Amino acid sequence: MTKRTFGGTSRKRKRVSGFRVRMRSHTGRRVVRTRRKRGRSRLTV
């Protein structure tokens, strides 16, 4: 069996789907708004 080598990179993840990136675009703001409305504890990554 081979090892699972994918670890995930936090910097990359933040750059793609962090809070500040979400606030940049209209659709990103909509995502945050929807998640607030649903009562999510984590709005973004």
Curated annotation (Swiss-Prot):
InterPro entries: Ribosomal_bL34, Ribosomal_bL34_CS. Keywords: Ribonucleoprotein, Ribosomal protein. One of its GO terms (biological process) is translation. PROSITE patterns: RIBOSOMAL_L34. Residues 10-45 have a biased composition (Basic residues). It comes from the Bacteria. Signal peptide: none annotated. GO terms for cellular component: ribonucleoprotein complex; ribosome. Belongs to the bacterial ribosomal protein bL34 family. This is Large ribosomal subunit protein bL34. It comes from Prochlorococcus marinus (strain NATL2A). The gene is rpmH.
